Amino acid sequence: MINFACISPHAPILLPDVGSKEDRETVKKTIEGLYFLGEKFKELKPDSIIISSPHPDWGFNVPLYFLARDFKGEIKTFLIGNETPEFYFNQGKEFYTKYDIQNTKYNVALIASGDLSHCLKEEGPYGFHPDGPKFDKELIECLKKKDIENILKLDNIYPEAGECGLRSFCFLLGILETSKINYQTEILSYEGPFGVGYLVANFKLS
């Protein structure tokens, strides 16, 4: 059964061996949110992890550093490509059925790795675009409301947002939707001081 699910940013700057002390202080809320998730992960003791990411290296490594650094169980990685959000939502549904997650006797953790808009500030990696902050705000509101229908449309509504997490999040949401587990989205932190939106969210499962 699924007993843990979350959204995690994956910026290497969050890591103590990469980010400077000053940079990490600037994203203190994000780091605190990730450590909170790490404590939750330890408390719930999942036996295996399913983690999705648009990047094959830091996309997996950064969330796992904070959440499951000493984890010894099985880790299944799912690499996200450029297909539509709806495609990955359906992939999540198929993944749930293919691996018979419903009937497993083990506890499973879901981690959706991804960053929000990279266009929040002129000095950010892709400059500023008004789609950026609008996308981030609406995505967070939709997650709170469990409004999957509109989440799947955000890519078309804000095509210049420059995000890299939406499809990863949709994969996780597809799994949750198929599981029929009731959940509430708890936003632990959101900030974008470097022009990239970092969201940390916990799905409270019941």
Language-model-detected regions and their locations in the chain:
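A short aromatic-anchored loop/beta-hairpin motif
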Residues: M1-F60, Y65, K76
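Glycine-rich phosphate- or other oxyanion-binding loops that anchor nucleotides, phosphorylated ligands
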Residues: G59-N103
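Gly/Ser/Thr-rich active-site loops/lids in small-molecule metabolic enzymes
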Residues: G127-N150
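Active-site beta-strand/loop microenvironment that shapes enzyme catalytic pockets
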Residues: F87-F135
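Flexible, glycine/proline-enriched loop segments at strand-loop-helix junctions
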Residues: R24-E25, F78-Y88, Y126, Y158-P159
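Membrane-interface soluble catalytic domains
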Residues: E191-S206
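Polyanion-binding loop/helix "lid" in catalytic or ligand-binding cores
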Residues: E32-G33, K145-Y190
